[in-house]
Protein backbone atom coordinates (compact mmCIF):
# COMPACT_ATOMS: atom_id res chain seq x y z
CA UNK A 1 0.00 0.00 0.00
CA UNK A 2 1.46 3.35 -1.01
CA UNK A 3 1.51 6.34 1.29
CA UNK A 4 -1.51 8.56 1.14
CA UNK A 5 -0.57 11.65 -0.86
CA UNK A 6 -1.74 15.23 -0.38
CA UNK A 7 -4.45 16.95 -2.36
CA UNK A 8 -3.54 20.08 -4.28
CA UNK A 9 -2.95 23.10 -2.08
CA UNK A 10 -5.28 26.03 -2.49
CA UNK A 11 -3.12 29.21 -2.47
CA UNK A 12 -5.58 31.09 -0.27
CA UNK A 13 -5.03 28.51 2.47
CA UNK A 14 -1.41 29.56 2.85
CA UNK A 15 -1.04 32.44 5.29
CA UNK A 16 1.96 34.70 5.76
CA UNK A 17 2.93 35.36 9.34
CA UNK A 18 2.69 39.10 8.71
CA UNK A 19 -1.05 38.87 8.07
CA UNK A 20 -2.05 35.73 9.92
CA UNK A 21 -3.17 35.68 13.55
CA UNK A 22 -0.45 35.22 16.11
CA UNK A 23 0.85 31.67 15.48
CA UNK A 24 1.71 31.30 19.14
CA UNK A 25 -1.93 31.37 20.18
CA UNK A 26 -4.07 29.94 17.39
CA UNK A 27 -5.13 26.52 16.22
CA UNK A 28 -5.68 25.44 12.63
CA UNK A 29 -9.30 26.47 12.99
CA UNK A 30 -8.35 29.98 14.07
CA UNK A 31 -9.56 29.50 17.63
CA UNK A 32 -7.54 30.83 20.53
CA UNK A 33 -5.68 28.10 22.38
CA UNK A 34 -4.95 29.14 25.95
CA UNK A 35 -1.56 28.68 27.50
CA UNK A 36 -1.32 26.59 30.66
CA UNK A 37 -1.07 28.47 33.96
CA UNK A 38 2.30 30.16 34.04
CA UNK A 39 2.91 29.16 30.42
CA UNK A 40 5.25 31.04 28.12
CA UNK A 41 4.28 31.79 24.49
CA UNK A 42 6.43 29.91 22.01
CA UNK A 43 8.57 32.25 19.90
CA UNK A 44 9.54 31.40 16.32
CA UNK A 45 12.12 28.64 16.16
CA UNK A 46 14.16 30.40 13.46
CA UNK A 47 14.84 33.97 12.39
CA UNK A 48 12.93 33.73 9.14
CA UNK A 49 9.63 34.44 7.47
CA UNK A 50 6.88 32.13 8.69
CA UNK A 51 4.22 30.62 6.47
CA UNK A 52 1.37 28.33 7.50
CA UNK A 53 -0.20 25.59 5.40
CA UNK A 54 -3.86 25.14 6.30
CA UNK A 55 -5.23 21.80 5.12
CA UNK A 56 -5.68 19.27 3.95
CA UNK A 57 -4.24 17.68 7.04
CA UNK A 58 -2.93 19.39 10.18
CA UNK A 59 -1.76 22.98 10.06
CA UNK A 60 1.97 23.08 9.26
CA UNK A 61 4.37 25.90 10.13
CA UNK A 62 7.13 26.69 7.63
CA UNK A 63 10.21 28.87 8.01
CA UNK A 64 11.18 30.22 4.61
CA UNK A 65 14.17 32.08 3.21
CA UNK A 66 14.37 33.11 -0.45
CA UNK A 67 17.48 35.31 -0.70
CA UNK A 68 17.93 37.86 -3.44
CA UNK A 69 20.25 37.10 -6.32
CA UNK A 70 21.08 33.71 -7.76
CA UNK A 71 20.02 31.81 -4.66
CA UNK A 72 16.56 33.36 -4.71
CA UNK A 73 15.63 32.75 -8.33
CA UNK A 74 12.91 30.30 -9.20
CA UNK A 75 15.49 28.22 -11.09
CA UNK A 76 17.49 27.60 -7.91
CA UNK A 77 17.26 24.26 -6.09
CA UNK A 78 15.49 24.70 -2.73
CA UNK A 79 16.72 22.94 0.39
CA UNK A 80 14.02 21.41 2.61
CA UNK A 81 15.00 20.66 6.23
CA UNK A 82 13.09 18.31 8.55
CA UNK A 83 13.82 18.08 12.28
CA UNK A 84 13.98 14.88 14.31
CA UNK A 85 11.20 13.53 16.54
CA UNK A 86 11.44 13.61 20.32
CA UNK A 87 9.56 14.95 23.32
CA UNK A 88 10.42 18.57 22.51
CA UNK A 89 11.24 18.56 18.80
CA UNK A 90 10.93 21.57 16.49
CA UNK A 91 12.65 23.38 13.65
CA UNK A 92 14.88 25.01 16.29
CA UNK A 93 16.97 21.86 16.00
CA UNK A 94 17.83 22.91 12.43
CA UNK A 95 19.17 26.38 13.29
CA UNK A 96 22.84 25.88 12.24
CA UNK A 97 21.79 24.44 8.88
CA UNK A 98 19.14 27.05 8.20
CA UNK A 99 21.43 29.94 9.09
CA UNK A 100 24.25 28.61 6.92
CA UNK A 101 22.22 28.12 3.77
CA UNK A 102 19.54 30.82 4.06
CA UNK A 103 21.85 33.48 2.60
CA UNK A 104 22.85 31.50 -0.48
CA UNK A 105 19.88 29.42 -1.61
CA UNK A 106 16.13 29.01 -1.02
CA UNK A 107 15.61 27.14 2.25
CA UNK A 108 12.49 25.98 4.05
CA UNK A 109 12.33 24.23 7.43
CA UNK A 110 9.07 22.84 8.75
CA UNK A 111 7.66 22.02 12.14
CA UNK A 112 6.16 18.56 11.77
CA UNK A 113 2.54 18.10 12.90
CA UNK A 114 2.40 17.89 16.69
CA UNK A 115 5.57 19.93 17.17
CA UNK A 116 6.74 23.53 17.29
CA UNK A 117 4.17 25.94 15.91
CA UNK A 118 2.41 23.39 13.74
CA UNK A 119 -0.95 22.03 14.86
CA UNK A 120 -0.82 19.96 18.04
CA UNK A 121 -3.38 18.03 20.01
CA UNK A 122 -4.99 14.55 19.86
CA UNK A 123 -4.42 13.87 16.16
CA UNK A 124 -3.92 10.50 14.50
CA UNK A 125 -0.13 10.77 14.32
CA UNK A 126 1.40 8.37 11.83
CA UNK A 127 4.28 8.06 9.36
CA UNK A 128 1.81 8.85 6.57
CA UNK A 129 0.83 12.13 8.26
CA UNK A 130 4.46 13.20 8.60
CA UNK A 131 5.24 12.15 5.04
CA UNK A 132 2.31 14.16 3.78
CA UNK A 133 3.58 17.26 5.62
CA UNK A 134 6.86 17.01 3.70
CA UNK A 135 5.06 16.56 0.38
CA UNK A 136 2.76 19.50 1.11
CA UNK A 137 5.84 21.62 1.80
CA UNK A 138 7.40 20.73 -1.55
CA UNK A 139 4.09 21.26 -3.29
CA UNK A 140 3.90 24.71 -1.72
CA UNK A 141 7.35 25.58 -3.10
CA UNK A 142 6.13 24.48 -6.52
CA UNK A 143 3.18 26.81 -6.06
CA UNK A 144 5.61 29.67 -5.42
CA UNK A 145 7.14 29.00 -8.81
CA UNK A 146 10.24 26.98 -7.93
CA UNK A 147 10.83 24.75 -10.91
CA UNK A 148 13.68 22.54 -9.71
CA UNK A 149 13.39 19.38 -7.60
CA UNK A 150 14.44 20.01 -4.00
CA UNK A 151 17.36 18.78 -1.94
CA UNK A 152 15.84 17.13 1.14
CA UNK A 153 17.64 16.74 4.47
CA UNK A 154 16.02 14.99 7.44
CA UNK A 155 17.27 14.07 10.90
CA UNK A 156 16.86 10.81 12.85
CA UNK A 157 13.32 9.38 12.68
CA UNK A 158 12.32 11.99 10.10
CA UNK A 159 14.69 10.23 7.71
CA UNK A 160 11.99 7.56 7.47
CA UNK A 161 9.36 10.14 6.51
CA UNK A 162 11.77 11.70 4.02
CA UNK A 163 12.41 8.35 2.37
CA UNK A 164 8.69 7.67 2.05
CA UNK A 165 8.16 11.10 0.49
CA UNK A 166 11.06 10.70 -1.93
CA UNK A 167 9.77 7.32 -3.08
CA UNK A 168 6.19 8.57 -3.42
CA UNK A 169 7.18 11.50 -5.66
CA UNK A 170 10.68 10.75 -6.98
CA UNK A 171 10.81 13.64 -9.45
CA UNK A 172 10.15 16.19 -6.73
CA UNK A 173 13.49 15.40 -5.06
CA UNK A 174 16.96 16.10 -6.44
CA UNK A 175 18.79 14.39 -3.56
CA UNK A 176 18.08 12.97 -0.11
CA UNK A 177 20.32 13.54 2.94
CA UNK A 178 19.71 11.42 6.03
CA UNK A 179 21.40 12.58 9.24
CA UNK A 180 21.63 9.88 11.94
CA UNK A 181 18.75 7.95 10.33
CA UNK A 182 16.75 5.40 12.27
CA UNK A 183 16.15 1.86 11.04
CA UNK A 184 19.77 0.93 10.30
CA UNK A 185 20.72 -0.55 13.67
CA UNK A 186 20.19 -4.23 12.86
CA UNK A 187 21.83 -6.55 10.35
CA UNK A 188 18.52 -8.40 10.04
CA UNK A 189 16.64 -6.52 7.34
CA UNK A 190 12.91 -7.11 7.65
CA UNK A 191 10.53 -6.50 4.73
CA UNK A 192 9.36 -2.95 4.20
CA UNK A 193 5.76 -2.63 5.42
CA UNK A 194 4.47 0.93 4.83
CA UNK A 195 0.95 0.05 5.96
CA UNK A 196 2.15 -1.00 9.44
CA UNK A 197 4.03 0.67 12.30
CA UNK A 198 6.08 -0.55 15.24
CA UNK A 199 3.48 0.64 17.72
CA UNK A 200 3.20 -1.35 20.95
CA UNK A 201 -0.49 -0.99 21.71
CA UNK A 202 -0.28 -1.99 25.35
CA UNK A 203 2.44 0.60 25.88
CA UNK A 204 0.32 3.19 24.06
CA UNK A 205 -2.61 2.46 26.37
CA UNK A 206 -0.39 2.78 29.42
CA UNK A 207 1.09 6.07 28.19
CA UNK A 208 -2.33 7.55 27.47
CA UNK A 209 -4.03 6.42 30.67
CA UNK A 210 -5.74 9.60 31.96
CA UNK A 211 -4.73 8.76 35.53
CA UNK A 212 -1.09 9.57 34.86
CA UNK A 213 -0.50 10.61 31.24
CA UNK A 214 -0.08 14.31 32.06
CA UNK A 215 2.23 13.63 34.99
CA UNK A 216 4.29 11.23 32.88
CA UNK A 217 4.67 13.77 30.10
CA UNK A 218 5.66 16.50 32.55
CA UNK A 219 8.35 14.20 33.94
CA UNK A 220 9.66 13.45 30.44
CA UNK A 221 9.78 17.13 29.53
CA UNK A 222 11.10 18.76 32.68
CA UNK A 223 14.20 20.89 32.20
CA UNK A 224 16.30 18.17 33.83
CA UNK A 225 14.87 15.48 31.55
CA UNK A 226 15.32 17.53 28.39
CA UNK A 227 18.91 18.31 29.38
CA UNK A 228 19.50 14.61 30.05
CA UNK A 229 18.20 13.54 26.64
CA UNK A 230 20.21 16.24 24.85
CA UNK A 231 23.35 14.98 26.59
CA UNK A 232 22.54 11.49 25.31
CA UNK A 233 22.03 12.91 21.83
CA UNK A 234 25.32 14.79 21.93
CA UNK A 235 27.12 12.01 23.76
CA UNK A 236 28.65 14.86 25.71
CA UNK A 237 27.96 17.39 28.46
CA UNK A 238 28.58 20.20 25.96
CA UNK A 239 25.05 20.59 24.56
CA UNK A 240 23.58 23.61 22.79
CA UNK A 241 22.09 25.82 25.51
CA UNK A 242 19.92 27.82 23.12
CA UNK A 243 18.28 24.63 21.90
CA UNK A 244 17.74 23.50 25.49
CA UNK A 245 15.93 26.73 26.37
CA UNK A 246 13.69 26.56 23.31
CA UNK A 247 12.87 22.90 23.90
CA UNK A 248 11.79 23.60 27.48
CA UNK A 249 9.29 26.22 26.30
CA UNK A 250 8.12 24.17 23.32
CA UNK A 251 7.41 21.10 25.44
CA UNK A 252 4.95 22.93 27.70
CA UNK A 253 2.68 24.28 24.95
CA UNK A 254 -1.00 23.26 24.83
CA UNK A 255 -1.51 19.85 23.25
CA UNK A 256 2.23 19.16 23.21
CA UNK A 257 2.09 15.70 24.78
CA UNK A 258 0.20 13.81 22.09
CA UNK A 259 2.79 13.50 19.32
CA UNK A 260 5.69 12.63 21.67
CA UNK A 261 3.63 9.89 23.31
CA UNK A 262 2.82 8.47 19.88
CA UNK A 263 6.55 8.52 19.19
CA UNK A 264 7.41 6.72 22.45
CA UNK A 265 4.82 4.03 21.70
CA UNK A 266 6.47 3.26 18.35
CA UNK A 267 3.56 4.54 16.27
CA UNK A 268 5.80 6.71 14.08
CA UNK A 269 8.29 3.98 13.10
CA UNK A 270 7.91 1.93 9.91
CA UNK A 271 9.01 -1.74 9.76
CA UNK A 272 11.70 -2.54 7.22
CA UNK A 273 12.57 1.08 6.45
CA UNK A 274 16.16 0.07 5.59
CA UNK A 275 14.84 -1.71 2.53
CA UNK A 276 13.12 1.49 1.43
CA UNK A 277 16.34 3.47 1.91
CA UNK A 278 18.11 1.04 -0.43
CA UNK A 279 15.40 1.45 -3.08
CA UNK A 280 15.51 5.25 -3.22
CA UNK A 281 16.19 6.34 -6.79
CA UNK A 282 17.76 9.65 -5.79
CA UNK A 283 21.39 10.08 -4.73
CA UNK A 284 21.50 9.56 -0.95
CA UNK A 285 23.88 11.03 1.62
CA UNK A 286 23.97 9.32 5.01
CA UNK A 287 25.88 10.89 7.89
CA UNK A 288 26.10 10.05 11.56
CA UNK A 289 28.28 10.42 14.63
CA UNK A 290 30.07 8.01 16.95
CA UNK A 291 29.01 9.29 20.37
CA UNK A 292 25.83 9.06 22.39
CA UNK A 293 22.79 6.86 21.92
CA UNK A 294 22.58 6.97 18.13
CA UNK A 295 25.64 5.10 16.93
CA UNK A 296 24.31 1.72 15.76
CA UNK A 297 24.37 1.48 11.97
CA UNK A 298 25.18 -2.20 11.54
CA UNK A 299 22.85 -2.52 8.57
CA UNK A 300 25.05 -0.24 6.47
CA UNK A 301 27.79 -2.86 6.32
CA UNK A 302 25.34 -5.56 5.21
CA UNK A 303 23.32 -3.61 2.67
CA UNK A 304 24.04 -3.53 -1.02
CA UNK A 305 23.90 0.23 -1.22
CA UNK A 306 23.52 1.87 -4.63
CA UNK A 307 26.48 3.59 -6.29
CA UNK A 308 24.70 6.88 -5.72
CA UNK A 309 25.10 6.60 -1.93
CA UNK A 310 27.71 8.48 0.07
CA UNK A 311 28.26 7.74 3.79
CA UNK A 312 30.19 10.14 6.05
CA UNK A 313 30.97 9.51 9.71
CA UNK A 314 31.81 12.34 12.11
CA UNK A 315 33.51 12.15 15.50
CA UNK A 316 30.48 13.76 17.11
CA UNK A 317 27.08 12.99 18.55
CA UNK A 318 23.89 12.57 16.53
CA UNK A 319 23.70 16.21 15.38
CA UNK A 320 27.13 16.80 13.82
CA UNK A 321 26.11 20.09 12.23
CA UNK A 322 26.01 21.63 15.72
CA UNK A 323 29.48 20.42 16.68
CA UNK A 324 31.45 20.57 13.41
CA UNK A 325 29.32 22.83 11.20
CA UNK A 326 32.05 23.70 8.71
CA UNK A 327 33.16 20.11 8.20
CA UNK A 328 29.57 18.91 7.99
CA UNK A 329 28.74 21.51 5.35
CA UNK A 330 31.87 20.76 3.32
CA UNK A 331 31.05 17.04 3.21
CA UNK A 332 27.43 17.70 2.30
CA UNK A 333 28.38 20.17 -0.40
CA UNK A 334 30.93 17.70 -1.80
CA UNK A 335 28.08 15.19 -2.04
CA UNK A 336 25.93 17.72 -3.91
CA UNK A 337 28.76 18.40 -6.35
CA UNK A 338 29.03 14.67 -6.95
CA UNK A 339 25.29 14.54 -7.58
CA UNK A 340 25.61 17.19 -10.26
CA UNK A 341 28.58 15.41 -11.82
CA UNK A 342 26.91 11.99 -11.99
CA UNK A 343 23.21 12.70 -12.45
CA UNK A 344 23.39 11.90 -16.18
CA UNK A 345 24.94 8.45 -15.80
CA UNK A 346 22.77 5.58 -17.13
CA UNK A 347 22.32 3.89 -13.74
CA UNK A 348 20.90 7.05 -12.18
CA UNK A 349 18.51 7.74 -15.04
CA UNK A 350 17.36 4.13 -15.09
CA UNK A 351 16.59 4.17 -11.35
CA UNK A 352 14.63 7.41 -11.68
CA UNK A 353 12.67 6.05 -14.62
CA UNK A 354 11.72 2.86 -12.77
CA UNK A 355 10.70 4.83 -9.67
CA UNK A 356 8.63 7.25 -11.71
CA UNK A 357 6.77 4.43 -13.41
CA UNK A 358 6.01 2.85 -10.04
CA UNK A 359 4.94 6.06 -8.28
CA UNK A 360 1.32 7.22 -8.05
CA UNK A 361 0.07 9.67 -10.66
CA UNK A 362 -1.06 12.57 -8.46
CA UNK A 363 -0.88 16.34 -8.32
CA UNK A 364 -2.09 19.05 -10.62
CA UNK A 365 -2.64 18.41 -14.29
CA UNK A 366 0.58 20.25 -15.08
CA UNK A 367 2.58 18.13 -12.65
CA UNK A 368 1.03 14.94 -14.03
CA UNK A 369 1.91 15.95 -17.58
CA UNK A 370 5.48 16.84 -16.63
CA UNK A 371 5.95 13.52 -14.83
CA UNK A 372 4.58 11.55 -17.78
CA UNK A 373 6.79 13.43 -20.23
CA UNK A 374 9.85 12.91 -18.03
CA UNK A 375 9.08 9.20 -17.69
CA UNK A 376 8.80 8.80 -21.45
CA UNK A 377 12.07 10.63 -22.03
CA UNK A 378 13.88 8.63 -19.37
CA UNK A 379 12.61 5.34 -20.81
CA UNK A 380 14.02 6.30 -24.21
CA UNK A 381 17.37 7.36 -22.75
CA UNK A 382 17.66 4.20 -20.68
CA UNK A 383 16.82 2.02 -23.69
CA UNK A 384 19.45 3.78 -25.79
CA UNK A 385 22.04 3.18 -23.09
CA UNK A 386 23.08 6.80 -22.60
Stretches with model-predicted labels:
Residues 167, 176-212:
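Flexible "cap/lid" loop of the alpha/beta hydrolase fold
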Residues 2-52, 63, 353:
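An N-terminal hydrophobic leader/cap segment in hydrolases
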Residues 154, 158, 162:
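Gly/Ala-rich beta-loop-alpha elbow adjacent to hydrolase catalytic centers
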Residues 316-329:
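Catalytic histidine-centered segment of alpha/beta-hydrolase-like enzymes
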Residues 214-278:
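Conserved alpha/beta-hydrolase catalytic His-Asp/Glu region
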Residues 64-117:
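Conserved HGGG/HGGXW glycine-rich cap/lid loop of the alpha/beta-hydrolase fold
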Residues 279-316:
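Conserved loop-alpha-helix segment in the C-terminal half of the alpha/beta-hydrolase fold
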Amino acid sequence: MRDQLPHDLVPERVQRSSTAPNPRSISSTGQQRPLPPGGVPLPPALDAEQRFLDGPGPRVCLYLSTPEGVGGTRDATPLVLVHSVNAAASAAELRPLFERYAAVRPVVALDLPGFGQSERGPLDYSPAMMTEAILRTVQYLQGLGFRQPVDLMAVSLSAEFAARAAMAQPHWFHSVALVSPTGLDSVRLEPYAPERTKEKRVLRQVLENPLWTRALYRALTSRASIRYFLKRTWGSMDIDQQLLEYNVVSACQPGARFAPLAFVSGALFTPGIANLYARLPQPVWISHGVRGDFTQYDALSHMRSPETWVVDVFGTGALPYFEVPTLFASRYEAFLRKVEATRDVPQWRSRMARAALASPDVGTGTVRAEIKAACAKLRVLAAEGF
